[in-house]
Amino acid sequence: MDSINKDVLDACRGLAAYGMGTGIGGQISIRIPGEELMVSHAFDKTFEEMHEADIFTVDFNGNPVGTNRPVSIGIEFHHGIYRQRPDVNAIIHSHGFWATTQAALARPLRIFANVTTPFYGKTCTSPNDDFASIGPALGEEDIAIIIPWHGVITIGNGIAEAVAYHTTFDYGARQDLTLPADTPTMPEDQIAEIATMVNGTGYYKHTWDLVRRTGQECYNGTRVFPRLIP
């Protein structure tokens, strides 16, 4: 199995293990270097159900290559982002409960933990999930996109970053949604320093490795059964 295809499959199963793949919808993609192509997956299965045959190449017009399997219409914003942001090589959009509920607030995360500091000032809000809406909203350094009443997109220079951002956003959303509205957030003068520290620790690679391991542990040979999250 091609390494990019395997990374997409591992991301599907890993996010499923974290409870972000229980329903139809969402997309994971990785850019194929030097070509207007990406690797994504079929629309008619959940992340929990993905197998090798469900992973395939998609062109930048949103058409599957070499298969007639259906692909999500939402894939349109993926190639739009890849064209606008050459630094982005992987994109994640899921309908996990916490991130989707957070999106209903139509605002960035409140910062309560060191690992969520990288989202401060690098999260945009798009009024819709088409690229005509996302493109103008997306800044040059943004790593997350909130679509109100829909969900969240995370983007990274590779699959490790994109997946780690996604699971970390989900963690931050749980904090934001369960802590009282008057809970003090991290002081602004500390956020940049801590974000620099987080970005330099190898956190994203280690988190990706953890997510991948967890997906493998929760896969029973047929599908992924999500782990219990405290």
Which sequence ranges carry the predicted segments?
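Glycine-rich flexible loops
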Residues: 1-230
